[in-house]
Amino acid sequence: MSREALIERQTTETNIRLKVALDGSGTWQGSSGIPFFDHLLAQMARHGLLDLKVWAEGDLEVDNHHTVEDIGICLGQAVKKALGDKKGISRYGSALVPMDEALVLVALDFSGRPYLAWGLELPPGRIGSLETELVEEFLRAMVNNSGLTLHVRQLAGHNAHHLAEALFKALGRAIRQAVTLDPREQGIPSTKGILS
């Protein structure tokens, strides 16, 4: 069973082609046009053992918002499509990741009910050319389009780069845990018999 998906999205603001393989080796290819955002996506892919390819063109001359948000939309849709009916998945995942002074906790559930509980205090400003406020926008778009319940908590830290990187590493590890197929689970991991 191949658990991968390709999503294409074209608007007047962006043109995005995104491919994800859930049972990958952690490879990243492509470009969003925003180097630090690419770095974060590469960290998520590597630590999630996801193969992620992103080709994006956006109206970066306006700002980065449309591109970052639309990549979140595409990633959410791709993960949802790749999971199919979610039969046999572990469903839940969590990770606690340090990076120097920063410590970030991510807990998630592929419940089919989108919800983002945001508990990260990224200082206003930019990391490279990425506005820190767009990290939350990316996650909200991903959550809303994947049906994911996601909790993010900052337990320590103040450096925006370290916090963002710890977050994306933790997100990758939690996704990896949640999408892993459990050989003992023959059906949908829910007493309802459905995750939607």
Swiss-Prot record:
Q: Identify the EC number(s).
A: 4.2.1.19
Chief site of localization: cytoplasm
Annotated SUPFAM superfamilies: Ribosomal protein S5 domain 2-like
Localization annotation: Cytoplasm
Which pathway does the protein contribute to? Amino-acid biosynthesis; L-histidine biosynthesis; L-histidine from 5-phospho-alpha-D-ribose 1-diphosphate: step 6/9
Which keywords does this Swiss-Prot/TrEMBL entry list?
Amino-acid biosynthesis, Cytoplasm, Histidine biosynthesis, Lyase
- GO cellular component terms? cytoplasm
Q: Which reaction does it catalyse?
A: D-erythro-1-(imidazol-4-yl)glycerol 3-phosphate = 3-(imidazol-4-yl)-2-oxopropyl phosphate + H2O
Can you provide one Gene Ontology molecular function annotated for this UniProt record?
imidazoleglycerol-phosphate dehydratase activity
Q: Which GO terms describe its biological process?
A: L-histidine biosynthetic process
Would the keyword Secreted turn up in this protein's UniProt record? no
Q: Which Pfam families does the annotation name?
A: IGPD (PF00475)
**Family affiliation:** Belongs to the imidazoleglycerol-phosphate dehydratase family.
Question: Which NCBIfam families does its entry note?
Answer: PRK00951.2-1, PRK00951.2-4
Cross-referenced PANTHER family, in alphabetical order? IMIDAZOLEGLYCEROL-PHOSPHATE DEHYDRATASE (PTHR23133:SF2), IMIDAZOLEGLYCEROL-PHOSPHATE DEHYDRATASE HIS7 (PTHR23133)
Q: What is this protein called?
A: Imidazoleglycerol-phosphate dehydratase
Which taxonomic lineage does the organism of this UniProt entry have? Bacteria, Bacillati, Bacillota, Clostridia, Moorellales
The protein's gene is named hisB
